[in-house]
Amino acid sequence: MVLLDANILIGAFRPDDPDHARLKAWLEATLRDGVPVAFPALVEVAFLRIVTHPRVYRSPSPLAEAVGFLQAIRASGLFREAPWTLRARERWWAWCRDLGLHGDDVNDAYLAAVAAEARCPLVSRDQGYARFHGLDWLDPAAAH
């Protein structure tokens, strides 16, 4: 199983994303290879908020199209719920405290904790995940 960050979903969905072809191909290959994918509700919210936002895109995505993209992943038979456990919460708090995190970095620590406790790689274009000791993560846009 891999846990997807919103930026992977956005890149795979939006044709105007600079890494669209690579991220779409990666996501399609992952599902074709039978690898389960997960993302917490927070990632779905971020995805929908960003791709439909008129201040982010000149031509924001229609909500129905964006929801359809998420529903297709969920209906693939390979979608798994990302568990939010007490251990994940404690790891999240510890990383926030120990790394002195605030703002957007708190969200990153949350995703990292969910992935770490699920013992699966976090897939993101955000290089900042390297700071979370013990987290397995990868950036498919950087892979060659």
Name these PLM-found stretches:
Residues 38-41, 82:
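Short beta-strand segments at enzyme active-site cores
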Residues 1-39, 54-68, 118, 144:
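Short, well-structured N-terminal submotif of metal-dependent ribonuclease cores
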Residues 5, 108, 126:
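Acidic active-site catalytic centers that drive phospho-/nucleotidyl reactions
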Residues 52-79, 86, 95-97:
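Active-site-proximal, substrate-binding regions of enzyme catalytic domains
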Residues 78-123:
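Active-site neighborhoods of divalent-metal-dependent phosphate/nucleic-acid chemistry enzymes
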Residues 1, 86, 112-144:
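Acidic, PIN/NYN-like endoribonuclease modules and their adjacent C-terminal/linker elements
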Residues 13, 51, 133-136:
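Short, flexible helix/strand-to-coil boundary loops that buttress conserved ligand/catalytic motifs
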